[in-house]
């Protein structure tokens, strides 16, 4: 009998083992859809981004008007731009839900998969940041100035690093050109890291909602989960197109409709909504270096998740106390997101400081203590 090409061809074999004949736990829920959704988001972003780059000019005098030109004169340019801008928001929604699921279900115990995932998150954040600077509006310019300036808090070498990153003594043309180069390059790095992430995942196999070894009961990925993923795509692309077509500027800052002006500072400098939680943590510490360290720690703390897992059970499915803490953490992040969008005045300052403290206390102290307590209660 002739060999099945799908199973014998060197390239098709890899695709087959990853997307067709992959043994998958039979009980994974819709929370396991977000990985494939992130893949679709990334593909959409790269395609729309490529089309935008064809019409974009990375020059301070032309950047703003080149985007206006794209929206007005290019066939469906407005749609491509709106899909790209709002696609970023959707990508972040998916990645935050994906990470939340990982924390809830103890997926971080696949250490290599988890660590590559956190590196992916950091790369994605860098990509989104440099991308936000490209339209060269007021918030683009001042956001770039404020965030890059944080590196000057590094003792001794900080100022040198900032001027090296800027390519001068302020955010100007060299900064814009290099940010465009980086924004073009990083998504391909993300794609490469995604393949590494998947390689590690397929090495150990997927986790599942019960957190038990599922080897005794696995089903092929196709047709079961491929169908389920297509449903996920539809349910995700629907809100994206709705947003891009009906209220494309809902999540943007009106300040960015004004071309960048180094002489006029906007009243409230704030990043896009998906960075507000980290921005709130940064602002809640009055000291510059302290704020920068807290900002870095707010994401890097994810690397510690595998070390802080003290429970004898993998998931939180049967741990009511940890569940309570988990949802408190979610509420806490929503509060931080809200605080990040507010001006620095009473009562927002104290709320932000309390929420920032609670964020770290829950992750670093309460989760391990509660796990140990639950072990005792269950006589483990």
Curated annotation (Swiss-Prot):
CDD domains (alphabetical): cytochrome_b_C, Cytochrome_b_N
Binding sites annotated in the UniProt record for heme b b566: 98, 197
A Pfam family per the record: Cytochrome_B
Coiled-coil parts of chain: none
Keywords annotated in UniProt: Electron transport, Heme, Iron, Membrane, Metal-binding, Mitochondrion, Mitochondrion inner membrane, Respiratory chain, Transmembrane, Transmembrane helix, Transport, Ubiquinone
Compartment(s) where it occurs, according to its Swiss-Prot or TrEMBL record: Mitochondrion inner membrane
GO biological process: mitochondrial electron transport, ubiquinol to cytochrome c
TM segment ranges: 34-54, 78-99, 114-134, 179-199, 227-247, 289-309, 321-341, 348-368
Cofactors (names): heme b
GO cellular component, one term: respiratory chain complex III
PROSITE patterns xref list: CYTB_CTER (PS51003), CYTB_NTER (PS51002)
Gene Ontology molecular functions: metal ion binding; ubiquinol-cytochrome-c reductase activity
The keyword Plastid belongs to this UniProt entry's keyword annotation: no
Signal sequence range: none
Binding residues annotated for a ubiquinone, in chain numbering: 202
Membrane topology, as annotated: Multi-pass membrane protein
InterPro entries in the cross-refs: Cyt_b/b6_C (IPR005798), Cyt_b/b6_C_sf (IPR036150), Cyt_b/b6_N (IPR005797), Cytb/b6-like_sf (IPR027387), Cytochrome_b (IPR030689), Cytochrome_b_C_euk/bac (IPR048260), Cytochrome_b_N_euk/bac (IPR048259), Di-haem_cyt_TM (IPR016174)
Primary location class: mitochondrion
Superkingdom in the source lineage: Eukaryota
UniProt binding sites for heme b b562: 84, 183
Other remarks in the entry: Heme 1 (or BL or b562) is low-potential and absorbs at about 562 nm, and heme 2 (or BH or b566) is high-potential and absorbs at about 566 nm.
Family that this chain belongs to: Belongs to the cytochrome b family.
Record text on subunit structure and interactions: The cytochrome bc1 complex contains 11 subunits: 3 respiratory subunits (MT-CYB, CYC1 and UQCRFS1), 2 core proteins (UQCRC1 and UQCRC2) and 6 low-molecular weight proteins (UQCRH/QCR6, UQCRB/QCR7, UQCRQ/QCR8, UQCR10/QCR9, UQCR11/QCR10 and a cleavage product of UQCRFS1). This cytochrome bc1 complex then forms a dimer.
Function per UniProt: Component of the ubiquinol-cytochrome c reductase complex (complex III or cytochrome b-c1 complex) that is part of the mitochondrial respiratory chain. The b-c1 complex mediates electron transfer from ubiquinol to cytochrome c. Contributes to the generation of a proton gradient across the mitochondrial membrane that is then used for ATP synthesis.
Protein name, entry field: Cytochrome b
Gene: MT-CYB
């Amino acid at each position: 009998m002739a060999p099945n090409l799908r199973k014998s061809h060197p390239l098709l074999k890899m695709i087959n083992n990853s997307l067709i004949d992959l043994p998958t736990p039979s009980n994974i829920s819709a929370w396991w859809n977000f990985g494939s959704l992130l893949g679709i988001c990334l593909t959409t972003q790269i395609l729309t981004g490529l089309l935008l780059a064809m019409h974009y000019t990375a020059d301070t005098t032309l950047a703003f008007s080149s985007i206006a030109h794209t929206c007005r004169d290019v066939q469906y340019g407005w749609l491509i731009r709106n899909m790209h801008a709002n696609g970023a928001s959707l990508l972040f929604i998916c990645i935050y839900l994906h990470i939340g699921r990982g924390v809830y279900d103890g997926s971080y115990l696949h250490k290599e998969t988890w660590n590559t995932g956190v590196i992916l998150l950091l790369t994605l954040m860098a990509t989104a940041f440099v991308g936000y600077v490209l339209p060269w509006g007021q918030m683009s310019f001042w956001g770039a100035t404020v965030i890059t300036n944080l590196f000057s808090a590094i003792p001794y070498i900080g100022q040198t690093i900032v001027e090296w990153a800027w390519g001068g003594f302020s955010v100007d043309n060299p900064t814009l050109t290099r940010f465009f180069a980086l924004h073009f390059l990083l998504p391909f790095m993300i794609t490469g890291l995604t393949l590494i992430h998947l390689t590690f995942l397929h090495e150990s196999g997927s986790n599942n909602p019960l957190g038990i070894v599922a080897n005794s009961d696995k089903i092929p990925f196709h047709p079961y989960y491929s169908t389920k993923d297509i449903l996920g795509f539809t349910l995700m692309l629907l809100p994206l197109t709705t947003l891009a077509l009906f209220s494309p500027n809902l999540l943007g800052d009106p300040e960015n409709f004004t071309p960048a002006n180094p002489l006029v500072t906007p009243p409230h400098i704030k990043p896009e909504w998906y960075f507000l939680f980290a921005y709130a943590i940064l602002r809640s510490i009055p000291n510059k270096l302290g704020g920068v360290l807290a900002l870095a720690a707010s994401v890097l703390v994810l690397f510690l998740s595998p070390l802080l897992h003290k429970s004898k059970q993998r998931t939180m499915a049967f741990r009511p106390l940890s569940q309570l803490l988990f949802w408190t953490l979610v509420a806490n992040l929503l509060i931080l997101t809200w605080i990040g969008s507010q001006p620095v005045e009473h009562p927002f300052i104290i709320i932000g400081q309390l929420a920032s403290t609670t964020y770290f206390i829950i992750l670093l102290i309460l989760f391990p203590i509660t796990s140990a307590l639950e072990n005792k209660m269950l006589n483990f």
